[in-house]
């Protein structure tokens, strides 16, 4: 098993990618601290069983981040992996309809949250790596919107672009520690955050249009993103550092076009 006896924290573990990742880490032998601002995190931990602990936490609160890491240290004797996944969308308002309070809150959770995770988890992961002679990993959840925002939310897109840059900066500043820092960049994924989009498409008989701009022509499932996070956290990615891995069905590989523009049709 890839994470046998490893100590892992997953934030945003109450639903979506975080829940799928927490379950996947445990299935691979990890002891997991499941953290989320909602009570749903208790269900995730219960699903996993004795290998999991649950804690309510606000990803953008330094006090809560410190408290969550302390739980992992107390329960599991150290920390090997931090998956800083918690985030919020902030809606789809354009620049002119986005007020300072909204963008501040999105940045607090989506960007300051990963910053705090790195700041407080990295020293513990480095300490564990030195003790074991191995390495540790921090994985952040960014977004394809942080690579190429298109017409998306300015608050969300800016926050996720910041996460990508933060992963790169942290990888450099943790030089020599054997702690790797990478980010996953999901495309449209069926989670609690995007549930209204998928539900509307199903009700309207238009589910085939979800994700139509990417070459796979579908949205992702949380388990697919979880597997990407596990890869980056695992020894299989031992030489992958400071990278932003797009897991978006190919959306970011090109500017959005349709075959009709070139006089061709889909195969």
Label every PLM stretch briefly.
Residues 7, 14-16:
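Conserved glycine-rich cofactor-binding loop
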Residues 93-95, 102-107, 210:
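Substrate-binding pocket helix/loop in short-chain dehydrogenase/reductase
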Residues 123, 172-176, 238:
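Alpha-helical segment proximal to the catalytic Tyr-Lys
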Residues 143:
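Residue(s) in the substrate-gating loop at a strand-loop-helix junction
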